[in-house]
């Protein structure tokens, strides 16, 4: 019987604290990786230990800037060239997720582009949390594990035993998630329907409320 392939966890510079907490929970060491920066702003990634035949988990959020995404892509490329058995990208915050559809002419769809870049780089699986839009999972031809923080948040909020608690969402896109919180906790829901004239500026806002018993 062949030996089970080992798993190894590595972190980019943007998510090292989380990776350390993950490794502590799994009782495994955080892998050694080196990121070399050059005078012109470029950087290169290298693994300081063998990952041949291992299941490699790469922890890195791709926000707030493009360097974090590029760093992850280089991590994936280096792992692929180092003969990892499989490569799993663990992206707690999936950047560019707000660009999930063509909502006006001549506009980019950043989430699809990021999905293509990760796939071409060579990931075999994606683990991410609370995507801005569920349909982003369909941008990938590989398995996507879409996790939800509600599994942690809901019991915690309930344990606080807060009075006059209301669940609110800043836009229609969050209504499904907010409704789940509202129903689970048995509290009212407030929905904000925003109107924008340009990005990052709200022209008007309508508030809708529902009682805890409403569906």
Language-model-detected regions and their locations in the chain:
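Conserved small/polar residues in nucleotide/adenosyl-binding loops
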Residues: 208-213
